[in-house]
């Protein structure tokens, strides 16, 4: 099992961090799901795609690399556009060469896994590079986009539209906890950080005692993906539940993926 490959030092580090914040350690650190094989094993991913295409989806999107050729072909067979995220000009060119229909150029302001190039620079760079190579696939702008004015600005730079994420995280319908939504409202744009402490790859998330600990001098260092998630997800889940129960120290650990646009969030509302 993958959990058996987690060094004891990392398990102890997480246990101590939880205890410091009044949270009972996660025990065996195992996720609720079966961890006998790496997440998103190719056969499993293809089965998920087959199920997805049985439904009336409007678009399917790939992140972290070039979509497999089978995914692109399935999109064509079902008349569903295939999009993919790019954090650099070179990424966009590889995606276009692979036959992707839509490219989401995601700047470093974005929440979750992201690169280092800002949206303001990335959009015109990607648009220019694609046109120079003869590709006419539309580009959607992503990363820090929270308002209509920002969308219009991105379209003025050549984007065909915008791809938004963080703007929805403070809504009542989102998957986030009430504790995290409240922290979003209180946060400034400088209160996010690109950290490996959650997934093992750099991902932008809200600064918290969790991210501080993994970037601190006593950190054992993040494990490679997907190992880090095996210890981070159960721990953060337990901390969130404890915070929801009134544990103020546990609240300090609560975090989630969110972009720098969080500074523009001033209330919790409905997506309707």
Which residue ranges define each predicted feature?
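Short hydrophobic "strand-cap" motifs at the C-terminus of beta-strands
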Residues: 142
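Conserved active-site-proximal phosphate/metal-binding subdomains
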Residues: 3-11, 18-19, 116-138, 146-272
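Residue-level detector of alpha-helix initiation sites
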Residues: 66, 145-146
């Amino acid at each position: 099992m993958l959990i058996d490959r987690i060094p004891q030092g990392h398990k102890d580090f997480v246990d101590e961090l939880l205890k410091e914040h009044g949270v009972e350690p996660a025990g065996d650190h195992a996720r609720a799901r079966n961890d006998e094989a790496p997440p998103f094993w190719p056969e499993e991913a293809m089965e998920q795609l087959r199920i997805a295409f049985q439904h009336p989806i409007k678009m399917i999107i790939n992140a972290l690399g070039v979509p497999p050729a089978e995914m692109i072909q399935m999109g064509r067979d079902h008349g569903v556009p295939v999009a993919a995220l790019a954090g650099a000009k070179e990424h966009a060119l590889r995606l276009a060469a692979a036959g992707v229909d839509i490219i989401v150029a995601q700047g470093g302001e974005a929440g979750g896994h992201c690169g280092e190039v800002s949206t303001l620079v990335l959009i015109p760079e990607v648009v220019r590079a694609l046109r120079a190579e003869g590709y006419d696939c539309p580009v959607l702008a992503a990363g820090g986009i929270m308002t209509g004015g920002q969308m219009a600005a991105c379209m003025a730079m050549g984007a065909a539209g915008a791809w938004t994420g963080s703007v929805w995280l403070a809504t009542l319908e989102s998957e986030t906890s009430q504790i995290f939504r409240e922290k979003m409202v209180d946060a400034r744009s400088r209160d996010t950080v690109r950290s490996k402490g959650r997934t093992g790859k750099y991902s932008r998330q809200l600064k918290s005692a969790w991210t501080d600990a993994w970037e601190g001098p006593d950190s054992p260092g993040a494990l490679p993906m997907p190992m880090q998630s095996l210890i981070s997800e159960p721990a953060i889940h337990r901390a969130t539940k404890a915070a929801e129960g009134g544990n103020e120290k546990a609240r300090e650990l609560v975090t989630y993926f969110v972009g720098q646009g969080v500074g523009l969030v001033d209330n919790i509302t409905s997506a309707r």
